[in-house]
Every structure is written in C-alpha cells, then in structure tokens.
Curated annotation (Swiss-Prot):
Changing V42A: Altered copper-induced relocalization. One of its GO terms (molecular function) is copper ion transmembrane transporter activity. It comes from Homo sapiens (Human). InterPro entries: ATPase_P-typ_cyto_dom_N, ATPase_P-typ_P_site, ATPase_P-typ_TM_dom_sf, ATPase_P-typ_transduc_dom_A_sf, HAD-like_sf, HAD_sf, Heavy-metal-associated_CS, HMA_Cu_ion-bd. The gene is ATP7B. Changing L776V: In WD; uncertain significance; no effect on copper transport activity; decreased localization to TGN and reduced capacity to redistribute to cytoplasmic vesicles under high-copper levels. This is Copper-transporting ATPase 2. Changing G1266V: In WD; decreased copper transport activity; loss of ATPase activity.
Length: 1465
C-alpha cells in the first residue's frame, strides 16, 4: 500500500510538472477533483493512472542553416530553451542541426522553426525525424479560426496584430495577411475561444469578424469553472452569468420572439454570411436567416436577453458599417405584435421602473471624426440613468436622445457629451405623452401572449466587454460627478513614422482606446497631440500603447503645445472701457489663454488653444459685442528672403549720396583739369571770409548733407556694432568718412579763426565719393542676395493666400461657401479646391477624384492620383476635378512649412570652412585700424625726412600750400584709403552665399541638404554604403517570371494565373501574397475563386482544391496581354469558351514538395530553377491535377537605376559597399546584378554602426544610404547619412541629406552638386583673400615707386566691387543642372559590365575574414536547390515606408518580356 501511494504521488508530481508547461492551474489536478474533471478536454485520458511524463514528451531534429560560430549556437539554445513547452535543446554547429525535447500539446516544431527564423537563421524540420504524437489517440488539441480584419493599412498593422495575439494564452501561431485582410490563428480551444480572439483584435482598433472556424469543444460546467482563469478576456462573473443564462434557456424553457428586420446596404453573399455569423453569436439570439433578395432578416430571440433596438445597433455596427436596419412599426415600444407563449422569465427583472412621460432632445455635437466617436458617445450616454435611447449621426453631427425628464435633463446630457471631449449644444426639445412602460438605460418592454410586460435588455454588439448591467458604478453616476476631472492634453514624441499610413494607424488605434478623447499626429514634426481623460488613462500608458504598435514613443514633459497666436485690428473702440470689455469677454471664453488689447494702436494679441477655438471664432466673439475685428496685415513670410527692405534702404542711401556726390565729382574733375589761365580757378579759390574759400564752402555743404542723409544707415549700424563691443565693415567706413570730415572741419575752423590768407586743402570731397560707391555696392550686393534665396522664396510662394471653406449638409451637399484667409483656416475645416487651384493645407480627401501636381515640392514629375482617403500636401496644384478635403495640419504644421523650415535652417547654418573665415574676419577690422594708423605715422615720418618722395606723388601740389600741410594731407589720404579698401565683407560672403544658392538649387531638384556641413562633406566622401532591402531593391517580393510547362490548349496562362492566385490567396506567406497580387493585376480583378482543403507545409509549399475560377476568366476587366498565337479568332483563350465549373487539385512549392506528391521534375525544369536561384530569386513549381504546368520566379527586385548609380559612383572614384542582414547567397546575387564587389552580409542592424566606424577608423569618409528607419543608427554615425524616401521623410532626424524622390541617382547628384558648391566657395575665398592681400599694400602706398597710387574714392569703389563680385560668383551655381538619366547612360555606355559571383567578396557578420566565392560543393548545391530562399524576406525586413510606397502597384508588368510572356520547354 505505501508503495502504491508513492507511485501515485510520483505520477501526480510529473503531472504537475507537465501542467506547469501548459500554464494550467495546479489546483485542477488535485486528487479530490479528479473524478469531476474532464481530462479528455485537455488531451488526456480520464484518470491519473495512465498519465506519465514520458508519454507526453517528444524529441525531434531541426535543420539550421546560417550558424557561423559557437556564439550562434549559444544564442539559439538560450532563446529556444526559454519557450513554454521546451524541455531541452542541444544545437550542433558541425551537423547544422538541433535536437529538441518538447511537449507537443504546448509547442510545435513549426513554432520553434519560426523563432529560429526570427533570429536570422534558416530552420526546417529534418525529414524523417519529426516526432510522432503519443500512441494514445488524443482529442483535438488545436483548432484553426480565420478572422476577417478590416482597417489594416500597412505592415505595421500586421506586426501589431501578430505581436499582440501571439502573446495571448492558448494561441499557438498567428499569420496576418495585409492583402487579403485576414488573420489565420491556430489556438488551443480549452484555453481560448474564437470570440475572444476576435474581441482582442477589435480592442486594437480594427474591425474583426469570424470568417470560418472549427466546432468548439463542449466543456462541462466544472471545466469552465477550472479553466476560465486562463482566459484573460472573460471575468469570472461574466462567465458564470453566461453559463447560468444558457442553463436557464436550455432547461427551463426559452421565450422566443420572432422579429423581421429590413436591412439595406447588403451587396453579396459575404454580407449575408457576415450578419448571420456575428448576430447569431449574440446572447439570446436563437437563429437568424438573412435574405439578400428581399433585403430582410428573420431573427428568433429571447426578449429577456436582447431587444429589437439592440439587434438593430449590432447589425449596423458590423463592418464595413454600411448596413442600415429598419425596425417594424411598434418594435421599439411596448405594443409590439411579436408575442411569446409564456410569461417573462423571473430571472431578468427590469433594472429600473419609472413611469411617466419621455422627452426627446436634439443635441448638436462637433468634433466627431469617425464611427468610433459615434459608438463612444452612444455607449457612454446610453448608460446614464434616465436615458432610454440615443441615436448619433456622424454626417449631421447630431444626437437624438429619448430620456426621462424626471431623472436627467438636456443640459446634463450636453455636459456628459462635452466631458467626453466633444463640443455639444442643445438644439431643441420635444415632449412625448406616450408612456413607454418600464424603460431604463438599455431596457425596453415587449409584451408576451398574456399581456405581461417583459423586460428586454438591449445588448450591444459583442465586443468582449461586460454587458451594460455589469458596467462600473461610475458610469451610472450623475453628470456632475463625471465632470469632476476635466480632460487633459499631452504631447508625445513619436519616432519610426514614415508615411501617412503610420499616422492613420496610430490615430485609429488610439481613438479606440478607453479614455482617449481625441488624437492628432503630425508626421513632419514627429509629434502627437492627445486629449485624454486622466481618470481612465495616463500619458505613459498612451506611450506604451503606441510602442506596442511598433513605434518609439516618449512623453514630452516640458512641451507647451502648439498654442495659436493671432493679431487682430479692432475698430470702434473709444475708451479704456471698450478695452476692458473686449479683454474680459475673451478671457472668459473657453480655449483662450491670453488676450491683450491696445487702444492706441487698435490692435489685439490673442493666444488660444487651436484644439478648442479658432481665429474665426475669436473674430465672431468680438463682433458680437459691437466691434469690428479683422486680421492684422502682416508682411508675407517670404519678404525677408527677397531682401526688399534692404534693397530699398540701400537704393535710397545711394541716390542721396549720388545727388550730392555728383557736384563733388564734377568739382574734383574741374580742379584736376590743367589750365594755362589761372583766373579760371581763382573764382573757386576766392575767400568769402578769411580762411574760407568758395570751393571749401561748397564741399562743406555737400559733405554735411551726405553725412546726415546718405551715411545715416552706416552710422546706425556702426553704433549698434560698437555698442555690442564688436567691429564690422560699417565701423571701418564710418571711421574713414568721419576722420576725413572732422579733420577737414577742424583745419577749416582753425583757418577761419586765424584769418588765414588762403583756405586750407580739405578732405570734404572724400566722404561723398566713399558713400556713393559703397552704397552702390551694398545695393547691388542685396540685389544679388535676393537671387540666392529665390528657390526658398519660390517654395514659400506655393502657399495659397485664401481657402474656400465649405459647410456640408446631408449627403455631403455644400450648404455654404466662404473665402477665408489662410491664417484663419482651422484644423478640421472642410476646404473645397477647384481645378487649377492650390491645396491650401495638408489634409485628407473626403470627396472627389483628381490628379495633384506635386513637382515643386517632391520633384515628382508625374501628377499623383488623389481619391477619397488620400493625403494632400499644401502647395501642390489640383490638376483637374474639384475635391473636398478635411484640414489635418494648418499653418506652420504643414509639410510645406516644415520643408521651408528645413531649407531655412540649412541656409542659416555654416560650413566648417566658413567658421574659419568668420574667425579671420573677427580679427580683420582691428588689424586694418592698426594698419591705417601705422600708414599715417610712417608717411608723416617719411615726409619730414624726405619731402621729395611725398611731393613727387602728391597730385597737383599748390604753391600756396605749406610743406607740412602737404605731408599731413598725403599721410591722411593713404591712411583713409587703407580703411576704405579693406573688405571683410568679401570673406564673410564667400561661403554663405554659395551655401544658400547650393541648398536652394538642391531643394529644387528634390534633394534636401540639412546645412552647410553635409554640403561641404559630400565632396570628401570616398566610400558609400548601401542598405539592400528598400534601397537597392524595392523591399517587397515581386513575380519576376512566369514559365508555362504544360499544354497551352488545356491550361492557358489566364487559367493558370486564376488557379494559382486563388490557391495562394489562402496563404499568409510573403511569397504567396506576391503571387496573389501579381495574378490579380494581370487578370484585372479583385475577386478570385474558392479554395478548399487548404494545407500549408512550412519550408515546402501548399496544396488545396480550387473551384469557381470560370467567372474570373469570363468577367476580368482587361484581357491579359498574351501572345496572339495563343488566342482564337474571338480574342479569347481556347479553354475559356466552355464555362463548365471545374475543380482543380493544386500543388505549389519547391522540388521536394512536388516529389513527395509523386511528380517527376525533369532536368530542364531543374536547370531553369537553378538559374533563377543563382540570381537570388525563389523559384516555385505549380502542378494542377497532377500535371507539372508552370514555374514562377519571385524576388525582391532590384531598382532599375541601381546598377547605373553604382557604376557612376565608382567612375567618380568612390568605393561602393553593400551592407545587409540578408544571407550571403542573396546578397551576392544582388551585388552581381548592380556591380558591387564588396558585400557585408548577415549583419545585424547594431553591427552596421560598427562597420561604419571600422571604415572611418581607416581614415575614410563614409556615406550611408538607407531607408532612414531601420538604418538610423548607421545614418547618424556616418559622415553623411542619406535617407531615401518620399517627401514626408524630412522628419528623419538621423539623415543629413533627404532625397525626396526614391531615386538612387540623386545620391550621385548630391555628391556632384557638393563638389560644384565647394569649388565655388574656394574660388570666392581665393578672390577675397587675393583682393585684400594685394589691395591693402597698394592703398598704403607700398607700390608708389612703380607709380601705383590710389585715392580714397578709388579704394571704396574697389571694395564695393569685391563684395559684388563674390556674390555674382556664387550666383553662377544657379546655372547648375542635375545630370539627367540620358547623360548618365551615355557616360556608362560600353563600360558597365555585370560581375560574376567569383568577383564579389562577401564578408559575413562581424567576422574579419573576407569570403570569396568558392566552388559550390555537392551538398551546397543540393541544399541550395531544395530549399526556398526566404531569408531575404525575414532577415532584412522591408521598412514600413517601402511597403507603403509600393501600395500603388507596379507601373510595368513584372514579366521579364512583355512580348514573350509564356515560355515552353
């Protein structure tokens, strides 16, 4: 007896160990409960005696390719050993395999292979070594359900659904198909049910419906009680209640009512199936029959569990949301004709019994954006006490509420809606005298046969949440209690968004989350503005939710938000009382944070929250209190770019100086003309008073006016510079003119005071001449500068000045149109854009179809198709067709504004070479002042030592002038000339003007360069590293070739494509998705045939039966461009003339899969497959009805321009490297196609940074070219990061250069433009340096011995000419033309040669050994041929952007040869 007890104890211990692997509650295995527990439902026989650990543990072998070292072995063992159900795992590097001991009921080998594949290796089940199930026959351990999932827009949605569902307990595996909008889930039915899976997908913001499933397990009450703790979705109370309800219905007799509904909006049998499957699952629904022809549904239901109104709502809530249900007369009230034969169940008494009159109120609601808002309002308000019924219309923006006025008032209803984050106002009320019986929130009355009123609880569509009567108590509180905490707003920084689909994904999913009231995501800024209920959710939870969607999110703690500012002009104010009236009214308005009104200027500055209120609303408030308000006129944003103010200023200064300078120049010329008649000059030399001649008096008057008028701006600028303890060119000019003026004035005053016989020689002629030439130079300089920013000004000029804001009524009919200035357009406005007009804001198309010209923004030459749901960019031109768009980003948040901001910042930034010039210019002015002083002193000394030197070069010395006066005058002349000729401006303008022109020209060519540093760095690049997936290739698999192997008369190409497309439509594999997409495009249809008996074998292929393809062939929209020899006289294929329904047995897969199914593969077919596989493509075979009939080659296709771009870079002396996480074979195949002979393969993303650093440590300047998402660390590490994508990729912070168009030749163009720009900068600097190095010595008189002498006005003219010449030199960059494709092809003609595999060196992972292409061993050939190369689709995953950019479909057929699509062997 003790021995038996020990055996029983040992078996129980083993059972608990296995159960821990299953994650089942241990208490379920207590001996006291063993008699009542249904072991057969979890896959074991009843009783513990037959259960042993060995009987439930299996051992299998998995083949693994791609391991290179013991680190790979350890990483695989560590990761797989941690999986549930894995007992042990041993990996052998030498044998390339792993031995796995596992529990089959918990984990399967396919899961193990999938996990290994996610690590970057290739894994498959070894043939003949798969574990067998235990000898005892086990009940169904796994079941499969197929869900229809609506709302997925990109690969991010797929990853999000797969990631979340895979984490659920009881889910074995999940595959989501974006193209088919389906999810296939394998699950353990004793742990989770299909309804729970559907509810989880719904909770993520998608619309899910069960498409097909296996019969659920029949669990007894004890099973439910013991297993429900493992179901995270169903609380215990809910499960018990459901069980009790079912027991009541099953054993006490149900009260069935038959109801006939009219349903509009059904189009096909799919709609019928959708309604029947989903409504049939609702609590209380016994049966439902839907007729598509009669547009009716006959429902048998239990009125104690549901009601007609609840059924109506449930059907209308089904995706796609187009169903409209009409109830029969009286179905909503108490007097319904549908009667039951028994009294109502005592188990469902009415929650509330309030007799009396019910009222109806109409509430206007603003801020609703989608059906989710409608459901949120209906769900929340219907739970309030006293609310009988609520119907919300999204199109009309209203809610009709039937309520009990003795319990709740319309004002409380309005407040409750506003607490949810919407704007609400009561429009009208009406009182009804018809008593509605025992109505309460969510209940209605239906009479039975004896007239007894029976409570019919309104059950919302099943969403996995608690029924209404299980809602928390807080939902039933009064509106006063729910308004205790006001909604709050938070801002999140989001990284990883690449396209509008990502924005839509985040907004849609967040709006479905409880507590989130409104969401607005800005792609360009990478920010999200979210209004939320702090009692329900917190910002960190929102950030975590976004991270679960596949993006990086962080809460911006110190971000104040994008509060709006508006400046208004207000007329009609008379006193301070008016000011106070306006300010107090504005500050009391919700949404306005600050208001300041100035009576003197009649201006008002208002700060507001654009989420709550807009500029038009503010103007309306001011006008309502008796004043007139309008938007204050401001200078357009582009005015500072065209330098109009500066040009006007310097033009005025030049003209003033010229008016007074011309007489001065005339007198100078007159005095310099030699004359033999001395009396002609005696008139001007005659003294008016002693010491003051007529000539000096005229000079003094003219010079004084020039100093005050022409030189005023120079003096203001010099004063500002000196006040900040700095010196610039204006200081030098003011010094020169002031010294000449003051010196002349002093000696003239002294002469007058001393009553000299002759008036002294003065410098009054110098300032007018200086100001004339310097002002002329500044004027011409700013004229030239205005041209440097012409590209940016052109971008800014794209912004529309006005927008047509419309008000929509029913059926989107336009009720009113209003022309609104751009500054007054608010977020959420509906804007009408006519043909030829500009899109004023970023938005989404609501109605209409058109083509948008985005060439000036993105550089895309061809117009882009826009349809409802498409995003539009502000500044693009509507080519044809009027459209209505909803504004999503206005003002500075638009894409155009962000691009302008980026280009502005680039033009303001300094290149490294400019920083050196700036440091030199900082010391330049003090140096010139010192040189000028030294020149003055030196010439005074020389003059007194040897007067002959000075006298020889002094122009026209007057015999009446003393020797000292001549020396002093000549010394001052040379000193002032030094001040005038020195020009730091030419040094300061050399780089900025070239950078401004260069970045502007680049922007016009679709290349956004972020500043002067990358612009200068690009010409130094010696190595360019290309990412493969999404950069060199398109990033998604495509069909490259279709090869027919059978009889074309029996199986023509159209029929093969129809059959193959239908078969692969049920596959979730990326290759299957690619084949399905190709077949649909070639056949011109979106619908395919029926697929049954589908079977997928990982690593091998699929098998199924296909039928109903005749309709596709008969009704395809466009004929396939097949060769004429395969068409009959009627133009159709021979096999299509008889539309006899057929069922085809289909096999699609690799060689091994077809051999397993008894097919023989000829050597010709095998050779054809090998040819494609050697190119890195995947070749699959197709067999129909046991006959091998075709081969399909699939690959991630190389971009057309890739090889040309690589060759051009190499011809420029740049080393090109391919770096990818893909396997070596695929990487080598891609490299041979594009001509790259250096490859880094099987590199993890974190290792890409190390590879960049490795090349940088060797002294090379490295450029990294990637998609800007997965490669962002490497982009940041590289000397120049280049992100390739659409115009929205300017949000990528890691890249230095963003190519708006997805064109690799723009990489070449950016380097080419950089070389041109840097060469122009060097020319400018050389000109500026030579000018100063030569000009200053000449001005100082160093070259007097060879007869070169300069007057001060000559120096000023030369200085002005230097600045103008530098700017004009930079403007020559505007003539730059980006080399076109024809030029590149002409240069490469005859030089581009494809590489062989032996010419490509492949570097594996972080290994330091280069691996040349060896001769393939027999084993390599066999393994390469027999396996499907899929790592290109798993190791180096395509970016979300690449997938989104490819959604529009291919522009060309994917067949290699359009004229020879069908090939035969």
């Amino acid at each position: 007896m003790p021995e038996q007890e020990r055996q029983i104890t040992a078996r129980e211990g083993a059972s608990r160990k296995i159960l821990s692997k299953l994650s089942l509650p241990t208490r379920a295995w207590e001996p006291a409960m063993k008699k009542s527990f249904a072991f057969d439902n979890v896959g074991y026989e009843g009783g513990l005696d037959g259960l042993g650990p060995s009987s439930q543990v299996a051992t299998s072998t998995v083949r693994i390719l791609g391991m290179t070292c013991q680190s790979c072995v350890k990483s695989i063992e560590d990761r797989i050993s941690n999986l549930k159900g894995i007992i042990s795992m041993k990996v052998s590097l030498e044998q390339g395999s792993a031995t796995v001991k596992y529990v089959p009921s918990v984990v399967c080998l396919q899961q193990v292979c999938h996990q290994i594949g996610d690590m970057g290796f290739e894994a498959s089940i070894a043939e003949g070594k798969a574990a067998s199930w235990p000898s005892r026959s086990l009940p169904a351990q796994e079941a499969v359900v197929k869900l229809r999932v609506e709302g997925m827009t990109c690969q991010s949605c797929v990853s999000s659904i797969e990631g979340k569902v895979r984490k659920l307990q009881g889910v074995v595996r999940v595959k989501v198909s974006l193209s088919n909008q389906e999810a296939v889930i394998t699950y353990q039915p004793y742990l989770i049910q299909p309804e729970d899976l559907r509810d989880h997908v719904n909770d993520m913001g998608f619309e899910a419906a069960i498409k097909s499933k296996v019969a659920p397990l029949s669990l007894g009450p004890i099973d439910i009680e013991r297993l429900q703790s493992t179901n995270p979705k169903r609380p215990l109370s809910s499960a018990n209640q459901n069980f009790n309800n079912s027991e009541t219905l099953g054993h006490q007799g149900s009260h069935v009512v038959t109801l006939q509904l009219r349903i509009d909006g059904m189009h096909c049998k799919s709609c019928v199936l959708n309604i029947e499957e989903n409504i049939g699952q609702l609590l209380g629904v016994q049966s439902i029959q839907v007729s598509l022809e009669n547009k009716t549904a006959q429902v048998k239901y239990d009125p104690s569990c549901t009601s007609p109104v609840a059924l109506q709502r449930a059907i209308e809530a089904l995706p796609p949301g187009n169903f409209k249900v009409s109830l029969p007369d009286g179905a909503e009230g108490s007097g319904t004709d549908h009667r039951s034969s028994s009294s109502h169940s005592p188990g469902s008494p009415p929650r509330n019994q309030v007799q009396g009159t019910c009222s109806t109120t109409l509430i206007a609601i603003a801020g609703m954006t989608c059906a989710s808002c409608v459901h949120s309002i209906e769900g929340m308000i219907s739970q309030l006490e006293g609310v009988q019924q609520i119907s919300v219309s999204l199109a009309e923006g209203t809610a009709t509420v039937l309520y009990n006025p003795s319990v709740i008032s319309p004002e409380e209803l309005r407040a409750a809606i506003e607490d949810m984050g919407f704007e609400a106002s009561v429009v009208s009320e009406s009182c009804s005298t018809n008593p509605l019986g025992n109505h309460s929130a969510g209940n209605s009355m239906v009479q039975t046969t004896d007239g007894t009123p029976t409570s019919v609880q309104e059950v919302a569509p099943h969403t996995g949440r608690l029924p209404a009567n299980h809602a928390p108590d807080i939902l039933a509180k009064s509106p006063q209690s729910t308004r205790a905490v006001a909604p709050q707003k938070c801002f999140l920084q989001i990284k990883g968004m690449t396209c509008a689909s990502c924005v839509s994904n985040i907004e849609r999913n967040l709006q479905k989350e409880a507590g989130v009231l409104s969401v607005l995501v800005a792609l360009m800024a990478g920010k999200a503005e979210i209004k939320y209920d702090p009692e329900v959710i917190q910002p960190l939870e929102i950030a975590q939710f976004i991270q679960d969607l596949g993006f990086e999110a962080a809460v911006m703690e110190d971000y104040a938000g994008s509060d709006g500012n508006i400046e208004l002009t207000i007329t009609g104010m008379t006193c301070a009382s008016c000011v106070h009236n306006i300010e107090s009214k504005l500050t009391r308005t919700n949404g306005i944070t600050y208001a300041s009104v100035a009576l003197a200027t009649s201006k008002a500055l208002v700060k507001f929250d654009p989420e709550i209120i807009g500029p038009r609303d503010i103007i309306k408030i001011i006008e309502e209190i008796g004043f007139h308000a309008s938007l204050a006129q401001r200078n357009p944003n582009a005015h500072h770019l065209d330098h109009k103010m500066e040009i006007k200023q310097w033009k005025k200064s030049f003209l003033c100086s010229l008016v007074f300078g011309i007489p001065v120049m005339a007198l100078m010329i007159y005095m310099l003309i030699p004359s033999n008649e001395p009396h002609q000059s005696m008139v001007l030399d005659h003294n008016i008073i002693p010491g003051l001649s007529i000539l000096n008096l005229i000079f003094f008057i003219l010079c004084t006016f020039v100093q005050l008028l022409g030189g005023w701006y120079f003096y203001v600028q010099a004063y500002k510079s000196l006040r900040h303890r700095s010196a610039n060119m204006d200081v030098l000019i003011v010094l020169a003119t002031s010294i000449a003026y003051v010196y002349s004035l002093v000696i003239l005053v002294v002469a007058v005071a001393e009553k000299a016989e002759r008036s002294p020689v003065t410098f009054f002629d110098t300032p007018p001449m200086l100001f004339v030439f310097i002002a002329l130079g500044r004027w011409l300089e700013h004229l030239a500068k205005s041209k440097t920013s012409e590209a940016l000004a052109k971008l800014m000029s794209l912004q529309a000045t006005e927008a047509t804001v419309v008000t929509l009524g029913e059926d989107n009919l336009i009720i009113r149109e209003e022309q609104v200035p751009m500054e007054l357009v608010q977020r959420g406005d509906i804007v009408k854009v006519v043909p030829g007009g500009k899109f004023p804001v970023d938005g989404k198309v609501l109605e209409g179809n058109t083509m948008a010209d985005e060439s000036l923004i993105t550089g895309e030459a061809m117009p882009v198709t826009k349809k409802p749901g498409s995003t539009v960019i502000a500044g693009s031109i509507n080519a044809h067709g009027s459209v209505l768009i909803k504004a999503t980003h206005v003002g500075n948040d638009t894409t155009l504004a962000q691009i302008v901001k980026l280009v502005e910042e680039a033009q303001m930034s300094k290149a490294p070479i400019q920083q050196l010039a700036d440091r030199f210019s900082g010391y330049f002015v003090p140096f010139i002042i010192i040189m000028s002083t030294l020149t003055l002193v030196v010439w005074i000394v020389i003059g007194f030592i040897d007067f002959g030197v000075v006298q020889r070069y002094f122009p026209n010395p007057n015999k009446h002038i003393s020797q000292t006066e001549v020396i002093i005058r000549f010394a001052f002349q040379t000193s002032i000339t030094v001040l005038c000729i020195a020009c730091p401006c030419s040094l300061g303008l050399a780089t900025p003007t070239a950078v401004m022109v260069g970045t502007g020209v680049a922007a016009q060519n679709g290349i956004l360069i972020k500043g002067g540093k990358p612009l200068e760095m690009a010409h130094k690049i010696k190595t360019v590293m290309f990412d493969k997936t999404g950069t060199i290739t398109h990033g998604v698999p495509r069909v490259m070739r279709v090869l027919l192997l059978g009889d074309v008369a029996t199986l023509p190409l159209r029929k093969v494509l129809a059959v193959v497309g239908t078969a692969e439509a049920s596959s979730e594999h990326p290759l299957g998705v690619a084949v399905t997409k190709y077949c649909k495009e070639e056949l011109g249809t979106e619908t395919l045939g029926y697929c049954t008996d589908f079977q997928a074998v990982p690593g091998c292929g699929i098998g199924c039966k296909v039928s109903n393809v005749e309709g596709i062939l008969a009704h395809s929209e466009r004929p396939l461009s097949a060769p004429a020899s395969h068409l009959n006289e009627a133009g159709s294929l021979p096999a299509e003339k008889d539309a006899v329904p057929q069922t085809f047995s289909v096999l699609i897969g690799n060689r091994e899969w077809l051999r397993r199914n008894g097919l023989t593969i000829s050597s010709d077919v095998s050779d054809a497959m090998t040819d494609h596989e050697m190119k890195g493509q995947t070749a699959i075979l197709v067999a129909i009805d046991g006959v091998l009939c075709g081969m399909i080659a699939i690959a991630d296709a190389v971009k057309q321009e890739a090889a040309l771009a690589v060759h051009t870079l190499q011809s420029m002396g740049v080393d090109v490297v391919l770096i990818t996480g893909d396997n070596r074979k695929t990487a080598r195949a891609i490299a041979t196609q594009v001509g790259i002979n250096k490859v880094f393969a099987e590199v993890l993303p974190s290792h890409k940074v190390a590879k960049v650093q490795e090349l940088q440590n060797k002294g090379k300047k490295v450029a990294m070219v990637g998609d800007g998402v997965n490669d962002s660390p490497a982009l940041a590490q590289a000397d120049m990061g280049v992100a390739i994508g659409t115009g929205t990729d300017v949000a990528i912070e890691a890249a230095d250069v963003v190519l708006i168009r997805n064109d690799l030749l723009d990489v070449v163009a950016s380097i080419h433009l950089s070389k041109r720009t840097v060469r122009r900068i060097r020319i400018n600097l050389v000109l500026a340096l030579i000018y100063n190095l030569v000009g200053i010595p000449i001005a100082a008189g160093v070259f007097m011995p060879i007869g070169i002498v300069l007057q001060p006005w000559m120096g000023s003219a030369a200085m002005a000419a230097s600045s103008v010449s530098v700017v004009l030199s930079s403007l020559q960059l505007k003539c730059y033309k980006k080399p076109d494709l024809e030029r590149y092809e002409a240069q490469a003609h005859g030089h581009m040669k494809p590489l062989t595999a032996s010419q490509v060196s492949v570097h594996i992972g972080m290994d330091d050994r280069w691996r040349d292409s060896p001769r393939a061993t027999p084993w390599d050939q066999v393994s390469y041929v027999s396996q499907v190369s899929l790592s290109s689709l798993t190791s180096d995953k395509p970016s979300r952007h690449s997938a989104a950019a490819d959604d529009d479909g291919d522009k060309w057929s994917l067949l290699l040869n359009g004229r020879d699509e069908e090939q035969y062997i």
